[in-house]
Amino acid sequence: MNTRTPADWKALFESDAFAQQNTYTGPLGVEYTPAGTRLRLWAPTARQVYVNLYRRGDGGVCIGSLPLEKRGQGLWSVYLPGDQHGRYYTYTLHAGGTSWEAADPYARAAGVNGRRSMIADFARIDPPGWLHDHRPNIPVSHRSVWEVNVRDFSQDPASGVRPAWRGKYLAFAQQGTTLHSDGIHPTCLNYLKRLGVSYVQLMPIFDFGSVDESRSLTRQYNWGYDPAHFNIPEGSYSTDPTRGEVRVRECKQMIAALHAAGIGVIMDVVYNHMYGNDNVLNRAVPYYYFRQNEDGSFSNGSGCGNEFASERPMARRYLIDSVLYWAREYHIDGFRFDLMGLYDVETMNLLRAELDQLPGGRNILMYGEPWQGGVSALHRYEANKNNLAMLNERIGIFCDNTRDAIKGGCFDAREPGYVEGKESALWDIGAAVAAWCRSSALPPHSPGQIVSYVSAHDNFTLWDKLLFVRYKRPEYGAMDSVALAQNRLAAGIYLTCMGLPFWQAGEEFARTKKGQGNSYRSSPALNRLDWQRAQQFHELVDYYRGLIGLRRYFPRLSALDTASPAAIQFFSLEQPLVGWQLPANCGDGALWQALCVFYNPTGQEKTVPLPEGNWKLLSDGISSSLWRGESQIRSGQTVLLPTSATIFGKA
C-alpha cells in the first residue's frame, strides 16, 4: 500500500533524482500505421498499466485488455497489430493497492465527452484539400484581431446559417450568409471579409468539461475555460460528438474556410488549469502536472481549483508539445494564453523558440494575459507584466493599462475612462499611443508586445460599460448618440495606437449583454451575436471598417521597432485634448508621408492648431472613410468635433 502524502509527492516530483530518472524525450500518444499502432503513456508512478479496447466512443463492452510494457524514464508501451483506425481505448492504471481508468492525455481524437480516446488515421478523416491549406500571409501592418466564441458566432437564427450548422465549426465554412437570408446584409464569414479583420481569435476550442456533449445544447452554454483534453477539438461544436473523427474534420474545415478568406486563426489556449482535479492529467500521474503548496495541496492561482506546473520538466514538455501539435496539425496562426502569469518565463521563451523553428513559425503570433487569477505557488519568474523585460520580444501581453485609460476600470462598472470624461486619464492615453515604450510604468521591448484593446469576453461589453457609467438603469437596446460617439472615440484611439489592435466580436455594432459582466455560463441567447444589430448600427460598423482599412496605410503604427514610438511628437494642447504626429516616414507602403491625430473627449467643438503644411482630413470622428475619396485639405488650424478622434495625413 502506498502511504505517500501530497507533500511527499511534491518533494519527490521536485527532486533532481526524479527529473533525471523520469524525463522522457521520445514520442508519446498514438503512433498509427495501417499495419499496426504503438501506444505510449508516460506514467512513472504506476505499477501496472493496461489498455482497454472498445468499438464505440461510448457504451458497449470492452473487447480486449492488454498489458503495457514498462520501459525506462516512466514510459509504458504496447503494440496493437492490424489496422486500428476508429478503435477507442482507455488505460487502467494500478498503483498503491488501487486501480483506476483514464483516457490518454496525449490523445488526438475521442468519443463523446472525451471519456474514451480514439486511434485515428488523419489521412482518412481530414477534409478534402486540407493538405493544400496554408496560413495566409498577413503583413504586420494589416494585423487586427476579432475575438469570438464558436457558438456565439452563428447561434442567432437571423444569421442565415443553415439550422444544423448554427453554433458549430461548420458555420464558419458557409459562404454568402446574410441577415434572414435576405441576400443584402452580410453575416458571419461574409461579414468578416467585408469588415476587414485579419485574425479571428477563437475562444477555447479544445475539449472542455462544462458542456455535456451527449445532451441537447438548447439550455447548455459555457465559454469553455475548463479544459478536459488539450489536444482534441471540442465535440459540442461538431455536428456529431459521438464519432471522434467528426470534430477533427469539421474543426479543420472551419480553419480552412477562414484561411481561404485570408483570415488567420488564433487559438485561445487554457493550459493554466484543468476542469476539476479528477482530470486526464491527474489520472495519468497524480499530483505531477499541477503546482502544489508547501503542504502538498493544489495551488489555486487560476481560481479554478488547480494550476498547471509549467516548471516541472514533463509538464513543460506537455505544454510545448501540445501547442506545436496545434500549429502543425491544425495550421493555427497564433496562440492567446489565458492567465499567462501562471506560466514561468523560461517555458514561454522555450515555446516561442520552438514555434520559430516551424516553417513560417516566426509569423505565428503569441500573446497572453499577464496576470493570475489568484495567489500562486509559482515562486520563480512568472510570465507577467512585472517580468515583461524577461519575455521574448515577440511574446505580447494584453495591456489593461490602455483598456482602463480609455474606458475606465473593469472592476468598477461606474468608473469612467478618458472617453467618458476622465480628464486625468489623458497622460495614460499618451503613453498608450506609443505602446508604453516611453513610459516607465510598463516598458516593453517594442510596440509589438502590446495588445491594445478596450473589450474582450471578460467583463462588460464596451457598449454596456459606456451606458452603465452614465445611467443608473440603462436601456441597452436603445440607440444612444452619446454612447455612440464615445464608442467611436474609443475605437479611434486604440486603432491609432501602436501595437496590435484587438476587440471583442460585436463591439463594432454596440454588442450588449444587458449589463451581464460575466456571461461565461449565461444563456445562449444572451451570449450570441445579434446580427440584426449589425444592420441597426451599420454606421458604427462602417466606422470600424474605415479605421481598419486606414490603419493599414500607416505601417509604422504596427512597427516592431523601438525607433517608431520615439518618433512620435506630442502637441501642447488644452486639457483634456490629446494630439500627436508622426512627422515623417510612416512606413513602407504608407499613402501619406506624415500622420496627425487628435482626441477630443469633451462634448464641445475644439479648435486646435495644425502642424505646418497642408493636411488631408482622413477621418473626422463620424466618418472614418473620408480617406477613400477627395476630402478636405486643411492648414493652420482645424475644428475637432465633440467626442471624436480626428485623423489627418500629409501628402
Give the residues covered by each predicted segment:
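The feature marks proteins involved in alpha-glucan
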Residues: M1-P34, K70-Q174
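Glycan-recognition and catalytic regions of carbohydrate-active enzymes
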Residues: Q21-G26, T496-Q516, L526-L595
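Carbohydrate-binding surface patches
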Residues: E31-R47, A567-P611
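Beta-strand-rich binding/interaction modules
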Residues: L41, R47-C62, E605-I622
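Conserved, mostly hydrophobic/aromatic
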Residues: L41, Y91, V148, L202, ...
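C-terminal beta-strand-rich structural cap/linker in extracellular carbohydrate-active enzymes
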Residues: A43, H85-R87, E630-A651
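Substrate-binding/active-site clefts of carbohydrate-active enzymes
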Residues: R151-Y330, L339-P359, L365, S376-A377
